[in-house]
């Protein structure tokens, strides 16, 4: 039996994508994994990425929990995510006549209409930008007293010359992407629609968003922060063997919050990555600090997990040794592209 859940706003713009991990004809056993989701790998939750981090200040750019990341994460699309938005439009039967979906929109240039099919609906795979038409739609306007010229046009062209206004569904400002789905619900086909609505059209637009300044990242220990700077790879601090760090976190975010788990995770992650194994440890009753020190020594690092780092801009070493390691980082839904806000010119109130 499947448990049904009421759809909530929390899941807006979220993709649920399952894929099978077994093949037709394959014999399966009890408790064997049958399918994976886009957020899991072999049954384990996989929402983030392992990155190489350092706890240090960097010219004040990571002040107040701000995060500095390497341009390498942008180039490799490490934190790129797919974002899907659904746009809906209704075709109504008005008092002045029915609305019509059509690619023949008055006073709109050919360039804006090139992606519309014969019904005025945008085609699959079209790249759309702000103010592009998704569904071309015209609505009858109230008839006014006709001028002699309009009367002549009406007698020549008939209904085509009547008064209509453009009520097309357009891409809102700040949105862009590729059309990946179109659904048409029509009363003629037997679909149940509210009274007065003859047709409803849903258009899904997908956008790939790479990580950028203003996006929010977090770890597994409530250690969240906003990206303040994206540095070129060559400017990032690097180890003696030339390995640059991917993320610079502020050390001032740890003592007051007392979430020391991130420090243990970083040190154990460094040892596990170097020795080539995956460390699975439950919270509160897992690996001890003595075991972490032992693993660090085995992997060739000092037992305190601190190494000498060099400034990528000058090539000089930093005065103090720096704690470095491998940490699991997730990208949160708070993306800077959704945070835009504006006000019209006017008095302050």
Model-flagged regions — what are they?
Residues 1-17:
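Cyclophilin-like peptidyl-prolyl cis-trans isomerases
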Residues 18-349:
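Intrinsically disordered, low-complexity regulatory segments
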């Amino acid at each position: 039996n499947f448990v049904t859940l009421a759809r909530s706003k929390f899941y807006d713009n979220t993709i649920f994508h399952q894929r099978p991990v077994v093949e037709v004809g394959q014999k399966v056993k009890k408790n064997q994994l049958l399918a994976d989701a886009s957020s899991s790998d072999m049954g384990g939750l996989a929402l983030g990425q392992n990155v190489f981090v350092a706890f240090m200040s960097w010219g004040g750019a990571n002040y107040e929990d701000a995060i500095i990341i390497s341009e390498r994460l942008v180039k490799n699309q490490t934190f790129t995510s797919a974002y899907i938005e659904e746009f809906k439009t209704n075709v109504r039967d008005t008092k002045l006549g029915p609305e019509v979906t059509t690619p023949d929109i008055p006073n709109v240039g050919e360039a804006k209409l090139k992606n519309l099919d014969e019904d005025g609906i945008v085609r699959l795979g079209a790249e759309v930008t702000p103010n592009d038409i998704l569904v071309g739609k015209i609505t009858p306007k109230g008839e006014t007293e006709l001028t002699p010229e309009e009367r002549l046009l009406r007698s020549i062209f008939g209904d085509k010359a009547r008064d209509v206004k453009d009520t097309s569904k357009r891409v809102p400002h700040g949105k862009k992407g590729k059309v990946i789905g179109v659904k048409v619900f029509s009363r003629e086909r037997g679909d149940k629609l509210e009274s007065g609505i003859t047709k409803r059209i849903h258009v899904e637009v997908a956008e790939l968003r790479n990580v950028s300044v203003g996006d929010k990242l977090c770890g597994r220990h409530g250690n969240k922060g906003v990206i303040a700077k994206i540095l070129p790879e060559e400017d990032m601090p690097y180890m003696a063997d030339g390995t640059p760090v991917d993320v610079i976190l502020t050390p001032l975010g740890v003592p007051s919050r007392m979430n020391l788990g991130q420090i243990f995770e970083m040190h154990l992650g460094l040892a596990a990555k170097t020795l080539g194994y995956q460390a699975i440890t439950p919270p509160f009753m897992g690996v001890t600090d003595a075991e972490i020190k032992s693993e660090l020594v085995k992997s060739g690092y000092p037992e305190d997990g601190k190494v000498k780092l060099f400034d990528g801009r000058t090539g000089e070493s930093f005065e103090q040794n720096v704690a470095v390691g491998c940490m699991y980082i997730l990208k949160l839904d708070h993306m800077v592209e959704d945070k835009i806000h504006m006000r019209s010119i006017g008095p302050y109130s």
